[in-house]
Amino acid sequence: MKLTCMMIVAVLFLTAWTFATADDSSNGLENLFPKAHHEMKNPEASKLNERCLDAGEICDFFFPTCCGYCILLFCA
């Protein structure tokens, strides 16, 4: 009986928490994916457009863009 009451209270609490912290639904689907929407406006901002460097090419130690690892300024 106690377990049932605790489960009911937990479900009611989680339901109330969901409604209390939910965003305003008046926007509908407008702001559902704000980052993806921003990237569609600026396709150069997408990380999918970046090309990784092949093995043997020179890489930057602090910002490596290798497909594998950057070892001694060369992609491995």
Curated annotation (Swiss-Prot):
It is found in: Secreted. It comes from the Eukaryota. Keywords: Calcium channel impairing toxin, Disulfide bond, Ion channel impairing toxin, Knottin, Neurotoxin, Presynaptic neurotoxin, Secreted, Signal, Toxin, Voltage-gated calcium channel impairing toxin. Pfam families: Conotoxin. The keyword Kinase does not apply. The keyword Cell inner membrane does not apply. InterPro entries: Conotoxin. Expressed by the venom duct. Residues 1-22 form the signal peptide. Residues 23-50 form a propeptide. GO terms for molecular function: calcium channel regulator activity; ion channel inhibitor activity; toxin activity. The presence of a 'disulfide through disulfide knot' structurally defines this protein as a knottin. The cysteine framework is VI/VII (C-C-CC-C-C). Omega-conotoxins act at presynaptic membranes, they bind and block voltage-gated calcium channels (Cav). Belongs to the conotoxin O1 superfamily. This is Omega-conotoxin-like TxMKLT1-0141. It comes from Conus textile.
